């Protein structure tokens, strides 16, 4: 079970969340986000995989950020095409494509990205690009028959543990935590994250 904590920015908070047990850590390179990372922090995680989050960004700029931040994966939240995903994957980056889910038909577009992404991320549909703080109906995902593993996102918070323990899917690979564990934009409650990760990993391997 991959535990990704997204929307990180502040050096000491990065260090604390790394020590709390996160597997992956996300950095948002979308200027309109309240969690936008405008420059390289003084500390970047050494034990976590670094994930760069982009929205409708050019491949050239993505590759530059990947080099600057030592990114392992890129997470694409916009209208990126399967061809762009394929080229970025060929450049040596892990690719995570995000799909906004409100109904079963929203899963159909994922089929075009099979084979060119390492993971999908299913998030709650909203007017913006993620960060809604709301949970969608996870039962919709039982209709997903793809071969690409996925991360579950959208409104996860400390009280979500029981729901996660009930959820089952053979392609479910991990979860994405963000605003539900924040004390302010880009600042995570490391104690809450640590407790949640420990409780989850005791129950799910």
Swiss-Prot record:
MF terms (GO), sorted A to Z: phosphoribosylanthranilate isomerase activity
Record pathway: Amino-acid biosynthesis; L-tryptophan biosynthesis; L-tryptophan from chorismate: step 3/5
Keywords: Amino-acid biosynthesis, Aromatic amino acid biosynthesis, Isomerase, Tryptophan biosynthesis
A single GO BP: L-tryptophan biosynthetic process
Catalyzed reactions: N-(5-phospho-beta-D-ribosyl)anthranilate = 1-(2-carboxyphenylamino)-1-deoxy-D-ribulose 5-phosphate
Record-linked InterPro entries: Aldolase_TIM, PRAI_dom, RibuloseP-bd_barrel, TrpF_fam
Keyword Transferase: no
Documented EC number(s): 5.3.1.24
Pfam family name, one: PRAI
Domain of life of the native organism: Bacteria
PANTHER family according to UniProt: N-(5'-PHOSPHORIBOSYL)ANTHRANILATE ISOMERASE
Record-stated family: Belongs to the TrpF family.
HAMAP family, per the entry: PRAI (MF_00135)
Protein name: N-(5'-phosphoribosyl)anthranilate isomerase
Species: Phocaeicola vulgatus (strain ATCC 8482 / DSM 1447 / JCM 5826 / CCUG 4940 / NBRC 14291 / NCTC 11154)
């Amino acid at each position: 079970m991959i535990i990704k904590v997204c929307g990180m920015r502040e050096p000491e908070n990065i260090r604390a969340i790394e020590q709390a047990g996160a597997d992956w850590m996300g950095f948002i390179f979308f200027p309109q986000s309240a969690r936008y990372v405008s420059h390289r922090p003084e500390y970047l995680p050494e034990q976590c995989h670094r994930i760069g989050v982009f929205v409708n960004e050019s491949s050239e700029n993505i590759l530059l950020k990947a080099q600057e931040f030592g990114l392992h994966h890129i997470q694409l939240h916009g209208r990126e095409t399967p061809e762009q995903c394929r080229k970025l994957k060929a450049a040596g980056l892990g690719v995570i494509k995000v799909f906004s889910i409100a109904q079963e038909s929203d899963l159909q577009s994922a089929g075009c990205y099979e084979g060119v992404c390492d993971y999908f991320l299913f998030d709650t549909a909203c007017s913006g690009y993620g960060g809604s703080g709301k949970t969608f109906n996870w039962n919709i995902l039982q209709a997903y028959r793809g071969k690409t593993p996925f991360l579950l996102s959208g409104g996860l918070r400390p009280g979500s543990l029981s729901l996660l323990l009930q959820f089952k899917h053979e392609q479910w690979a991990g979860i994405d935590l963000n605003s539900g564990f924040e004390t302010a934009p880009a600042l995570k409650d490391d104690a809450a994250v640590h407790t949640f990760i420990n409780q989850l990993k005791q129950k799910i391997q």
